[in-house]
From Swiss-Prot:
Its main location: cytoplasm. GO terms for cellular component: cytosol. It comes from Cupriavidus pinatubonensis (strain JMP 134 / LMG 1197) (Cupriavidus necator (strain JMP 134)). It is found in: Cytoplasm. One of its GO terms (biological process) is regulation of DNA-templated transcription. It holds the Pfam family TACO1_YebC_N. This is Probable transcriptional regulatory protein Reut_A2522. NCBIfam families: PRK00110.1, PRK12378.1, YebC/PmpR family DNA-binding transcriptional regulator. GO terms for molecular function: DNA binding. Transmembrane segments: none annotated. Belongs to the TACO1 family.
């Protein structure tokens, strides 16, 4: 990826998410509930629950809210039943987009996602149409200036798959999804706290957008991210700042 893009794009996405803190809490409560429902209420034996709890704590969510979501998931409290749905589609220039949702009404969600695609110059694809262009992995991004050799040693010892230094000086570490929490803990114990850390669908190749096309593509991504049922949006589009 071009040096200007990796750090700027991921930091921009994080800032935009932080600006919608209230919505972030709503999404995280849904994710914690579903994670507990599918894998049980013990984060030590449920990596997905551990990740969602870590995100909630990073977002300053009160512990009571987190515990209520877990209880709802394991059946201790009444609540809405959510199902996971993934939609795939295309933006401008055939850029690939994955939209992960948690919903209590599949009909409503697919209509809203399809409308967002069509309104902003994209189109829905079929299941599997773009997912093969991404790799499911844990991803950590460290700021330019992080000592590369020490980070690489710590990351590989922790079980990371790869460590890449981008042209802009930022360093990216990837690992298997199920090892995310262990790698994160090991890196932090070694003194390395990532600016951004998450389990993602990482694009294998990227499409650069500049000028008017960048503006249009960003509007499509924003429209999808702003839908209530949408949890995550992944794309291989790189938007020029």
């Amino acid at each position: 990826m071009a040096g200007h893009s990796k750090w700027a794009n991921i930091k921009h996405k994080k800032a935009a998410a932080d600006a919608k803190r209230g919505k972030i809490w709503t999404r995280l409560i849904k994710e914690i509930t579903v994670a507990a429902k599918l894998g049980g209420g013990d984060p030590d034996s449920n990596p997905r629950l551990r990740l969602s709890m870590d995100k909630a704590m990073d977002a300053n969510m009160p512990k009571d809210n987190i515990q209520r979501a877990i209880q709802r998931g394991v059946g201790g409290l009444e609540g809405v039943n959510y199902e996971e749905i993934r939609y795939e589609g295309y933006g401008l220039s055939g850029a690939a987009i994955i939209v992960d949702c948690l919903t209590d009404n599949r009909t409503r969600t697919v209509a809203e996602v399809r409308h967002a695609f069509s309104k902003h110059g994209g189109n829905m694809g079929t299941e599997g149409s773009v997912a093969f262009m991404f790799t499911h992995c844990g991803q950590f991004l460290f700021a330019p200036g992080t000592p590369e050799d020490k980070l690489m040693d710590a990351a590989l010892e922790a079980g990371a798959d790869d460590v890449v230094t981008n042209e802009d000086g930022s360093i990216e570490v990837t690992c298997p999804p199920n090892d995310f929490s262990a790698v994160k803990a090991a890196l932090e114990a070694a003194g390395f706290k990532a600016e951004v850390a998450d389990v993602v669908m990482k694009p294998q190749n990227e499409v650069d957008f500049t000028g008017d096309d960048a503006v249009k593509m960003q509007k499509l991504l924003d429209a999808l991210e702003n839908l209530d049922d949408v949890q995550e949006v992944f794309t291989n589009a790189v938007i020029e700042e």
